[in-house]
């Protein structure tokens, strides 16, 4: 099947491009327009565009202006803060604060891409989700609803990914770009958050000097208005200010990958000597699984963030060693959770955690197999990148089940 990736793969093969055009001329023109957005300086694509009279300017890919971003940020903050004045904060914020923040990012890309179909899709998703969240029982006494609220931001993030890719979520390159953007956004948002806390603390201190005390309501209002706006501002910084040319996530992943490898190997050696004393400790298992997810993210960003033409043998060894060691840790976690299931019986929390560990284990094994295949066929890490992008639909399916289906199956218990 022809795609923009096909055109980019055969950019330097004029015979294949001519064959693709003759077989599907309308599809070729559509994909050529998208390929031009990805590689606007490509001489080959510009020649084809001239031949087919395709507009070279990218007027349909204009990023939202700063005024628009400020408007989205203010609207997100007000949408988060004003309803909280009429509802209990412990009821409203866990349900709607992450939802509003992530849908604000989706709004940014809807404005950028100007896609009517995706706009309708997001509006329908928002209406259904708002009704769904509004009708949920109290989350503090329900394990399934607690897990729902944990997975809901991931569901919103998947919708954002579809909007980010302008509906081309099935293409590998779109998924890679979204993963890279996600890593950069987390880091940029963290930096903006730190700066915001510093500015707030400085404001409070300066007013205290002149005898004016800013109470807790001021801090709550600043947080409620400011925090939901941070991801949108971070997106604007990445997309417009930095022109997508930053690689903080990949750089940090390269720095921390060997450090976490040392940590994991040391842990494996320690458990070999000392045994596994935390099997019956729930808090330790939670920390253990959090560490597992962090290591997986480092491995994934190390894979998708690096330039394959510049990767070294040592980098490849570090990545594969980290993945292999993480498989061992995941097996320990699964063993511990399985013991708790056998000893204490079935519970919703144990089921969710056990399933998540199974999914992560499957992803890690897939990466190992892809690495072995790439070594055998001398393909560098391209096979591992495919393993990363091809596994995303499995995570998406689980997130959809955990958010919208399983709570109903468990009757919100």
Per-range role (PLM):
Residues 53-62, 109-117, 164-182, 204-213, ...:
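Juxtamembrane membrane-water interface segments of multi-pass membrane proteins
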Residues 1-62:
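Soluble N-terminal domains of membrane-associated systems
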Residues 92-93, 219-223, 252-256, 274-292, ...:
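Transmembrane alpha-helix entry/boundary detector in multi-pass membrane proteins
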Residues 64-81, 121-131, 394-400:
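Alpha-helical transmembrane segments
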């Amino acid at each position: 099947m022809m795609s923009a990736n096909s055109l980019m793969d055969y950019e330097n093969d004029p015979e294949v491009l001519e064959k693709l055009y003759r077989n599907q001329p309308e599809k070729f023109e559509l994909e050529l327009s998208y390929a031009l957005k990805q590689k606007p300086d490509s001489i080959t694509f510009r020649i084809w565009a001239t031949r087919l009279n395709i507009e070279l300017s990218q007027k349909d890919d204009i990023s939202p202006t700063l005024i628009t971003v400020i408007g989205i940020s203010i609207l997100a903050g007000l949408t988060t803060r004003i309803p909280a004045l009429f509802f209990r904060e412990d009821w409203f914020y866990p349900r709607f604060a992450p939802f509003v923040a992530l849908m604000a990012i989706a709004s940014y890309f809807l404005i950028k891409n100007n896609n009517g179909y995706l706009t309708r899709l997001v509006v329908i998703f928002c209406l259904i989700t708002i009704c769904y969240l509004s009708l949920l029982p109290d989350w503090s006494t329900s394990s399934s609803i607690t897990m729902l609220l944990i997975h809901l931001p991931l569901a919103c993030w998947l919708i954002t990914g579809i909007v980010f890719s302008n509906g081309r979520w099935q293409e590998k390159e779109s998924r890679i770009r979204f993963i890279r953007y996600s890593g950069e956004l987390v880091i940029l948002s963290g930096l903006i958050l730190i700066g915001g806390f510093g500015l707030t603390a400085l404001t409070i201190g300066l007013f205290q000097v002149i005898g004016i005390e800013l109470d807790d309501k001021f801090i709550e209002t600043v947080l409620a208005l400011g925090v939901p706006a941070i991801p949108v501002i971070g997106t604007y910084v990445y997309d417009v200010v930095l022109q997508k040319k930053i690689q903080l996530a990949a750089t940090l992943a390269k720095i921390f990958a060997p450090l976490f490898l040392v940590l994991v190997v040391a842990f494996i050696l320690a458990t070999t000597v000392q045994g596994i004393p935390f099997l019956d400790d729930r808090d330790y298992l939670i920390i253990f699984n959090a560490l597992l997810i962090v290591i997986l993210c480092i491995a994934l960003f190390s894979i998708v963030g690096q330039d394959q033409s510049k990767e070294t043998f040592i980098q490849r060894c570090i990545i594969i060693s980290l993945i292999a060691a993480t498989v061992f840790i995941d097996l320990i976690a699964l063993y511990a959770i399985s013991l708790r299931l056998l000893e204490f019986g079935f519970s919703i929390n144990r089921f969710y955690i056990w399933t998540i560990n199974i999914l992560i284990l499957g992803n890690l094994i897939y990466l190992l197999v892809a690495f072995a295949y790439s070594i055998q066929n001398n393909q560098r890490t391209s096979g591992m990148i495919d393993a990363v992008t091809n596994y995303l639909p499995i995570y998406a399916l689980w997130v959809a089940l955990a958010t919208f289906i399983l709570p109903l199956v468990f009757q919100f218990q």
